[in-house]
């Protein structure tokens, strides 16, 4: 299994969530976050924003679907300008459902 953490622009988050749902990825965690990338913020007119609001989507998928999910997120979240996000992928050894105590997705 893979844990996918996608940090995207808030304006694209619902579009990404909808695209994931249409592809069968219904289970995810969504949270508002603040951060910055390599650009170290952004300057608009005379105001410098050190950190920018983003939305983080976290989901766990089977190994054989991870690449398709990553492609879907990058395609949907793309805006053509800097600061449109980052995707982090990590291995997941086990996942448990609290209610049933069962292991797996």
Swiss-Prot record:
What does UniProt give as GO cellular component? Answer: cytosol
Keywords for the protein's UniProt record, in alphabetical order: Nitrogen fixation, Transcription, Transcription regulation
A Pfam match: P-II
Q: Where are the coiled-coil regions?
A: none
User: What SMART domains has UniProt attached to this entry?
Assistant: P-II
Q: Which GO terms describe its biological process?
A: nitrogen fixation; regulation of nitrogen utilization
Which Gene Ontology terms cover its molecular function? Answer: ATP binding; enzyme regulator activity
**Signal peptide positions on this chain:** none
Biological role: Could be involved in the regulation of nitrogen fixation.
Q: Which family does it belong to?
A: Belongs to the P(II) protein family.
Q: What is this protein called?
A: Nitrogen fixation nifHD region glnB-like protein 1
Q: Which organism is it from?
A: Methanococcus maripaludis (Methanococcus deltae)
Q: Which gene encodes it?
A: glnBI
């Amino acid at each position: 299994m893979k844990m996918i953490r996608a940090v995207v622009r808030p304006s694209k988050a619902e579009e990404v969530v909808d695209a994931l749902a249409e592809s069968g990825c219904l289970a995810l965690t969504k949270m508002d976050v603040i951060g910055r990338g390599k650009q170290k913020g952004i300057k608009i007119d005379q105001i410098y924003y050190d950190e920018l609001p983003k939305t983080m989507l976290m989901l766990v998928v089977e190994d054989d679907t991870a690449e398709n999910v990553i492609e879907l997120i990058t395609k949907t979240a793309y805006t053509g300008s800097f600061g449109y996000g980052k995707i982090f992928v990590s291995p997941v050894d086990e996942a448990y459902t609290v209610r049933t105590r069962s292991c797996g997705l």
